């Protein structure tokens, strides 16, 4: 018994009983739970490039300032990128996170150790996690050599990067509401989330947004890519390509097919990709100018979230 505002003793057991019943109702009623939650509060950014770790580019600039802007607007964020060999670890104060490292990822019947590093952008109060591996990310370039030729193993590098992000997020025990993918290196994330990780508690309610940039690669992925990317939960029937080289257009369409929303991140977009996007039946955000894109993207997260919970 406790005194109420008038000093009268009341039986509080009934109050606590009501609270427990209400919480159990929320837990078991998905629709009510989502109304109660109202909006997506946690956003995971998977980025092909981020400045200042790499030179400025359309993707690198967006992925530097968008997470900061979204965080300043009240959402919780995590950000990942590959640890390319041309990133200066000492200057940028990267250090390995031992508790997150050590897993082996098998790609094409070969074990590849997963190494996780982290650094902070102090001005943004933002941490960036890096996916590293000696086989894939030690060369002193990003996705092309000094002559502008795409690396032959870019297909495996993209598989390793995306799977590395998924496994690390699981170890962090952090459940994202939205995953926002930037660049073709991240294009497998929608497929993996919707198929290979569909029943995982970290990702089963996650909605995926793919930002389509005009950053085509010049050498198609080999025909063996469709076999290398397979995981439990993914069938060859899920792919729009099998047993043939995969170009930028096909890879982008695969990402769009398994996404919950698409953003046109570059001012121009390949006509076939634009048409495919508009016919996909999911929310689509046209190109936004540099002055407005952070607010527009931030609002789009809730559009995608609410559309998926109608």
Functional labels for PLM-detected ranges:
Residues 25, 36-310:
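Catalytic cores of nucleotide-sugar-dependent glycosyltransferases that transfer UDP/GDP/TDP-activated
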Residues 4, 10, 31-34:
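Acidic, Ala/Val/Gly-enriched low-complexity intrinsically disordered segments
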């Amino acid at each position: 018994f406790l005194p109420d505002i008038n000093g009268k003793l009341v039986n509080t057991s009934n109050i606590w009983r009501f609270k427990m019943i209400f919480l159990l109702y929320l837990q078991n009623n998905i629709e009510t739970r989502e109304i109660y939650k109202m909006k997506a509060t946690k956003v995971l950014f998977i980025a092909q490039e981020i400045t200042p770790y790499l030179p400025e580019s359309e993707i690198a600039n967006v992925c530097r300032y968008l997470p900061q802007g979204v965080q300043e607007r009240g959402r919780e964020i995590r950000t990942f990128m590959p640890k390319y060999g041309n990133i200066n670890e000492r200057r940028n104060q990267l250090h390995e996170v031992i508790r997150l490292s050590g897993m082996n990822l098998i790609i094409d019947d070969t074990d590849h150790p997963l190494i996780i590093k982290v650094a902070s952008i102090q001005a943004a109060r933002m941490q960036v996690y890096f996916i590293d591996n000696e086989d894939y990310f030690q060369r002193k370039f990003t996705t092309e050599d000094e002559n502008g030729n795409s690396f032959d193993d870019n297909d495996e590098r993209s598989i390793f990067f995306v799977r590395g992000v998924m496994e690390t997020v699981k170890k962090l025990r952090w459940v994202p509401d939205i995953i926002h993918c930037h660049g073709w290196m991240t294009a497998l994330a929608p497929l993996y989330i919707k198929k290979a990780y569909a029943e995982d508690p970290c990702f089963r309610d996650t909605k995926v947004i793919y930002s389509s940039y005009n950053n085509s690669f010049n050498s198609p992925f080999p025909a063996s890519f469709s076999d290398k990317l397979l995981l439990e939960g993914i069938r060859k029937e899920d792919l729009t390509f099998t047993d043939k080289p995969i170009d930028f257009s096909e890879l982008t369409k695969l990402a769009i097919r398994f996404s919950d929303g698409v953003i046109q991140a570059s001012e121009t977009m390949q006509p076939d990709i634009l048409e495919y996007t508009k016919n996909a039946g999911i929310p689509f955000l046209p190109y936004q100018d540099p002055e407005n894109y952070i607010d527009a993207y931030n609002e789009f997260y809730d559009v995608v979230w609410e559309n998926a919970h109608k």
